[in-house]
């Protein structure tokens, strides 16, 4: 048995896929975060409750940690919740881990490519300056900075995932929303900014990368997790139209247009691939087909 893997946010979208990868490696997975029990392996706690969190982490004594618990939606309306969850919650977790009798072998913190903001470079690598454009990105940038306080006590690696999607993601995110509209064969969809480009990965690729970073990731390093290819919203609409056999009318709703929208996010995964080996590449069309079929039963 490889030992115990602690996954915060296990009950969330990404947590399920990460747990599957870790279990395949022989880890016993234990989850921490808000939400109900999952097969008896999920312990409910608000990471902002430092005392209770510390007690649970001391009981678990994890060998490896994947920290996913966070407010993950850029347009989340409660600013105080964004900062308290993403910064204070992370700080409490790191303090609890540092106090453990047995030092964790690796701690992976999931940040976000949104920290790069509107960088004026065609492809973003880890050397690019961070210039966050919204509260969510600022909170993730701050999380990265505060993690440096524990660099002598904990072997921390930071991932900066670009956009990713898959079966089970909330309809508040763009691609699940679009898939849902096409699967229900709705005639039109309301969107915000459509003149944007995003680097999309499959959640299964991201989960695989996270699991491998626990073994190969170098402490103190930051790694982009991305496909290296960006798509426009129009590209995605065309893929879904082909899958569903019809085109949908797009209406731009000003209420959905975000201030300080990042126009283009395209990442370089060279550092990641050099560290963990060849990535588990899944074409975006295949991901959309997987999501579409999961909803339609086809």
Model-found features: residue ranges?
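NAD(P)H-binding glycine-rich loop region in Rossmannoid oxidoreductase-like domains
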Residues: 47-85
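N-terminal Rossmann NAD(P)H-binding glycine-rich loop of SDR-like oxidoreductase domains
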Residues: 5-25
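Conserved Rossmann-fold NAD(P)-dependent oxidoreductase catalytic core, especially the SDR/UDP-sugar
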Residues: 91-135
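Active-site helix of classical SDR
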Residues: 135-142
């Amino acid at each position: 048995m490889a030992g115990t893997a602690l996954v915060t946010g296990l009950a969330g979208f990404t947590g399920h896929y990460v747990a599957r990868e870790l279990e395949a490696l022989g880890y016993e997975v234990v989850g921490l975060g808000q939400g109900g029990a999952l097969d008896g392996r999920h312990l409910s706690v608000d990471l902002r409750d430092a005392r209770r969190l510390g007690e649970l982490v001391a009981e678990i004594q994890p060998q490896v940690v994947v920290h996913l618990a966070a407010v993950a939606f850029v347009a989340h309306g409660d600013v105080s919740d964004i900062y308290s969850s993403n910064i204070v919650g992370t700080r409490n977790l790191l303090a609890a881990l540092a106090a453990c009798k047995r030092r964790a072998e690796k701690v992976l913190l999931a940040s976000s490519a949104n920290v790069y903001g509107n960088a004026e470079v065609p492809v973003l690598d880890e050397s690019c300056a961070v210039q966050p454009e919204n509260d969510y990105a600022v909170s993730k940038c701050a999380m990265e900075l505060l993690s440096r306080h524990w660099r002598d006590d904990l072997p921390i690696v930071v991932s900066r995932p670009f956009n990713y999607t898959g079966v089970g993601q909330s309809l508040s995110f763009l691609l699940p929303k679009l898939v849902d509209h096409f699967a229900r064969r709705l005639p039109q969809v309301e969107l915000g900014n459509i003149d944007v480009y995003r680097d999309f990965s499959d959640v299964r690729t991201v989960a695989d990368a996270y699991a491998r970073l626990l073994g190969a990731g170098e402490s103190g390093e930051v790694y982009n997790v991305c496909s290296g290819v960006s798509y426009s919203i129009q590209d995605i609409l065309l893929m879904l139209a082909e899958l569903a056999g019809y085109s949908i009318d797009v209406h731009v709703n000003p209420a959905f247009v975000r201030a300080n929208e990042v126009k283009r996010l395209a990442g370089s995964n060279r550092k990641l691939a050099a560290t963990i080996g060849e990535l588990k590449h899944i074409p975006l069309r295949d991901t959309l087909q997987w999501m579409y079929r999961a909803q339609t039963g086809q």
